[in-house]
């Protein structure tokens, strides 16, 4: 059982849902990232997504694009991100998912990346531009090294795509709550609950919902149906306003409030 699967199973055993938090690796620098991973876990993050900065982040809105630019300007590379994960493993065992685009992984080498990521303590990888139909070689490498490959479903996914993803899913399925790029939204789409239930009818793999979740109220609303709630842009936006200890305090307060809201969306068991 992977660390991600074990986390969802333990949360479900206690009736709770998962809070998944996203930060960009290397924003403002990797030393700060290494400090923030344990802080996020201590304040309620059950799983942490580390964004791998990329020069052409087509699925990301302005907030995460700017964050990626800051990280790249600070000299962040994939190999340095893996070294950071390996270093932080002495302080926390929270599941870590690398989220990004296929090009940096391809350039690194698929087998080499999977081996190095597993050795560093990476638990999962989500590549937004690698659909399951094209992921065979990469997934085989990841499977050999015990890394969960996480796929996306969207409001426009038809039954064939849903079955394709659910048949290949490991760790969790990431349901994108809106069409378009990442970013804060004013409300949750009415279709989310129904679409999540359709996915869950096809698979026992947990479903986490992300994109556009910005407030504890929205997180709690999504947690009523989903197995997990992903918050990204609203967290990354704090990096625009705060630095140092002030950033740590702002993150701790916000993530704690998100976790309290997610905990209210309990399972019926």
Swiss-Prot record:
Pfam families the UniProt entry points to: Trp_syntA
Gene that this polypeptide is encoded by: trpA
InterPro entries documented for this protein: Aldolase_TIM (IPR013785), RibuloseP-bd_barrel (IPR011060), Trp_synthase_alpha_AS (IPR018204), Trp_synthase_suA (IPR002028)
Similarity comment: family membership: Belongs to the TrpA family.
Domain of life: Bacteria
Descriptive protein name: Tryptophan synthase alpha chain
Organism field: Geobacter metallireducens (strain ATCC 53774 / DSM 7210 / GS-15)
Location of the active site: 49 (proton acceptor), 60 (proton acceptor)
Upper classification of the organism: Bacteria, Pseudomonadati, Thermodesulfobacteriota, Desulfuromonadia, Geobacterales
Catalytic activity from the UniProt record: (1S,2R)-1-C-(indol-3-yl)glycerol 3-phosphate + L-serine = D-glyceraldehyde 3-phosphate + L-tryptophan + H2O
């Amino acid at each position: 059982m992977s660390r991600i699967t074990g986390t969802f199973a333990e949360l479900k055993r206690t009736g709770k849902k998962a809070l998944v938090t996203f930060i960009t690796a290397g924003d403002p620098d990797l030393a700060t990232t290494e400090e923030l991973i344990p802080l996020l876990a201590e304040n309620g993050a059950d799983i942490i997504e580390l964004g791998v900065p990329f020069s052409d982040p087509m699925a990301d809105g302005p907030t995460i694009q700017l964050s990626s630019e800051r990280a790249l300007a600070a000299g962040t590379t994939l190999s340095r991100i893996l070294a950071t994960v390996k270093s932080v493993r002495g302080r926390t065992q929270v599941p870590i998912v690398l989220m990004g685009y296929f090009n940096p992984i391809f350039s690194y080498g698929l087998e080499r990346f999977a081996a190095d990521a597993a050795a560093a303590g990476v638990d999962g990888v989500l590549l937004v531009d690698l659909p399951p139909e094209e992921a065979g070689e990469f997934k085989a490498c990841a499977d050999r090294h015990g890394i969960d490959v996480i796929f996306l479903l969207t409001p426009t996914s038809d039954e064939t795509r849903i079955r394709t993803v659910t048949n290949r899913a490991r760790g969790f399925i990431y349901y994108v709550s809106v069409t378009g790029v990442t970013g804060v939204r004013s409300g949750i789409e009415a279709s989310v609950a129904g679409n999540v239930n359709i996915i869950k009818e096809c698979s026992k793999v947990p479903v986490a919902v992300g994109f556009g979740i910005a407030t504890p109220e929205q997180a709690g609303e999504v947690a009523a149906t989903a197995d997990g709630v992903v918050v990204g842009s609203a967290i990354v936006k704090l990096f625009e306003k705060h630095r140092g200890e002030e950033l740590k305090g702002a993150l701790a307060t916000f993530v704690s409030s998100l976790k309290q809201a997610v905990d209210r969306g309990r399972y019926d068991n």
